[in-house]
Amino acid sequence: HYNEVTGEKSRVLQGTATPTIAMIKGFCMGGGLAISLCCDMRYCSPDSVFGLPAAKLGVGYGFEGIRRLLEITSPAYAREICFTGRRFNAEEAKQMQLVNRILPDSEIEAFVEENATMIADNAPLTIGSLKQIFIELAKNPTDRDPERCKPFIEQCFSSEDYIEGRKAFLEKRKAQFK
């Protein structure tokens, strides 16, 4: 039952049309790690601690959670994380590609806010189409359908965003998307 509930919530988070950012400060264990892996980007503070203690607790860990872990890190690291159940620090998490960056406590919130603003300032249709492509690519290879992404891409080229982006580029100014 737990895997069904968390699996559904994870699919909702991972499938949202808006890019998601995990800001990790402190412990990121078990379900917290699973949630962070559903996000598009993950940033942590130096004192963050990561782990997947399912093996230490006798908990069965779901197929989708392991698949997401394998998408992000190598099979060797995924096995180490799962089989040992040990805790690891921010540097190890970065080495395993579980986080994009490690930022000082005093800078992490501003950095995440700045990145979120940069994303929000970009062409909404392009961001949406990119997100849909990433969602499609995250599916099992047999379930992927590149044709499902074509309308999103075509919509970009026939949009006001595209016209504004080209115009801004030629005028050497920042585009103002709606």
Where are the predicted features?
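A general structural signal for well-ordered alpha-helical segments in protein cores
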Residues: 6, 66, 75-78, 126-130, ...
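Short alpha-helical scaffolding segments that buttress acidic/His motifs in well-ordered protein cores
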Residues: 81-85, 130-133, 169
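C-terminal long alpha-helix characteristic of the crotonase
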Residues: 43-48, 99-147, 154-158, 176-178
